[in-house]
Amino acid sequence: METFTSIDAMRAWCREKSRGGNTIGLVPTMGALHEGHLSLVHAAKKDCDHCVTSIFVNPTQFAANEDLDQYPRPIEDDLAMLRDAGVEAVFMPTADEMYPGGPQTHATSVHPSAVAFPLEGVHRPEHFVGVATVVMKLFQAAPSDRAFFGRKDLQQLCVIEHMVRDLNLPIEIVPCDIVREPDGLAMSSRNRYLSDDQRQRALCISKSLNQVEQAFLEGNHDPKQLESIMADHLSPCDSVDYAVVVDRQTLLPISEITQNAVALVAVRVGVTRLIDNRELIVA
C-alpha cells in the first residue's frame, strides 16, 4: 500500500493506474475508521480496478465551537485497517497542502445547492460549504471514476450528488448503506466519545427510526404523526436538534408522503452529536 501527502504525486498515481481503461474508486474519509468506512472500501474494490482512500480532517467544515481539535486521529490504526482491507493507495495531505496559505485565507469555495440549507444547514451554517469545497478538491487531487459515500450522512450525500450534477463533474457517486452495530446504533467515529451510559441511551435513535418505519409500513403516511412517534422515543437524549420526515430529494417538509421520504434525526447525547436516518420508500 502506497501513501501520498502530495497532490501532484497522488494525481500522478491515479493517472498511471487509469491507463488502459482501468477504473479507480475513491473513498474519502476523515480517518478514525470503523466497519462503516471499510464497507465503502469493499464496495470500491468490488466495483473498480483500483481503490484509493483519503484521510483528511478538513478544518473548513468545523465551526469554531465544534470538535476539530478533539477529533480522533488514530492514523497508525487507520493505515493498518486499510492495508488489511487491500487498499492500494492512501492520500493523507496536510492542511497546507489542501489549502495553500491556510484555510482562513482560502478565498475560493464551492457554495452548494439549496439542499444544503435545511437541517444541518440551520444548525451548522458553514458546514456544507466546507464539505463541498474539500470534496471538490479531493476529486481534483485523486481523479477517480467513482466515489463512495455512506447514506448515514444523507444530507452530505445529497449535497455532493447535486454538486456533481450541477458542475458536470466526470465522476459517479455511489451511495452505500448505513452500517450498524449489532444493537442498532449507526457506526460513527464519534461513538468513541460516548460513556457506557451514553452509549446505552443513544440506542433510542435507531429505535425511534424503527418505530417510524414500522408505522409507515402499516400505512401511516402523515409526516407530523411520524415525527411525533420519533420525538416520543428520543427522550433519553440530552437534546434534539431535529427529528423530521421530509421529501427524499429536496429534504424539505411535506404534508403527506406521496413519494419517497426520509426520517432524519440529529441529537446530542452528553456533548456528542449523533445523526441517523431511515428512508421511507413508497411502494
Curated annotation (Swiss-Prot):
It is found in: Cytoplasm. Its main location: cytoplasm. One of its GO terms (cellular component) is cytosol. The reaction proceeds by a bi uni uni bi ping pong mechanism. Catalyzes the condensation of pantoate with beta-alanine in an ATP-dependent reaction via a pantoyl-adenylate intermediate. Homodimer. This is Pantothenate synthetase. The gene is panC.
